[in-house]
Amino acid sequence: VTWFASAPGKVMLAGEYAVLDGAPAIVVAVDRRAEAHLVDAPPAPSEFLSAAAAVVAREVGAEAAAALARVAVDSRALADRGLKLGLGSSAAATVAAIGAALHAVGRFAPEVVGALAATAHAEAQARRGAAGSGADVAAATWGGAIRFQGGRVTPVTLPPELALSFAWTGAVADTATLVAAVTATRGRPAVEAALLAIADASAALAEATTASAALTALAAAGRATADLGRAAEVALVPPSVTALTAALTPLGAVAKTTGAGGGDVIAIAAPTLVAPSAVTDAIIGAGLTPLTLAIDPRGVAITPAA
């Protein structure tokens, strides 16, 4: 192996559920990456790689499809002891795999990789009876912090005085099941009001230029997600997250579920003046596991093998 392609995982900070209606979502790429390279005897493809092969054959051609058929993907960094963390591993793997195939035939370009991966990932999800926003594919393609709305990607700069950290609930959430459960309650006034509040909070986070404004937006987003769960009668916010939120309030910090909620990764935001050890103590005290994660500015990339 002389090179490999890689793509980052993601955490959706705000805009969950509402993004499916065209509201903005704020998503950060994180430094757990899926890696892909070409091998002579690849393992059986996942449903996402099978969809990617079909899309690449259709849109790029037989040579690139043949390269993709030789791709092996390692996404173990996006899991913990075999349990998915909710970092968008299928999207990162799809982006990395297509990146590897296109690089192998001299056609690598992030915008092309991203477009093909978005189509492939959506087709694979549709076969499962699910529908995603595409935000995780966008984060894996472009890296950094982005505003994702209706398929459009805009870089955002989070306030430098805002410190982000992450924790794992210990519970694996099934995004498709949660989204279907919430979707089944659309039309209830309280559900629609919560979705509008999520959209407003996400837009406010995108425009925040100070840590105070960002924390206010994230707190509002967390409350709106809890309201959505109550209105839809779906368990979106685990009790441990409610406990952590209460413990962080005296520190001026905020915790909220990410993505579909129900488990997976929790985001914690605090002013940089707050001691990281105080945040870590609160995380552990609430029964959550601190995660070593940081925003990854790199999107899909080709790297020479060491």
Cite the ranges covered by each PLM segment:
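Short glycine/threonine-rich catalytic loop with a Thr-x-Gly-x-Asp
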Residues: 87-89, 255-262
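DPxDG-like acidic metal-binding loop motif
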Residues: 30, 84-110
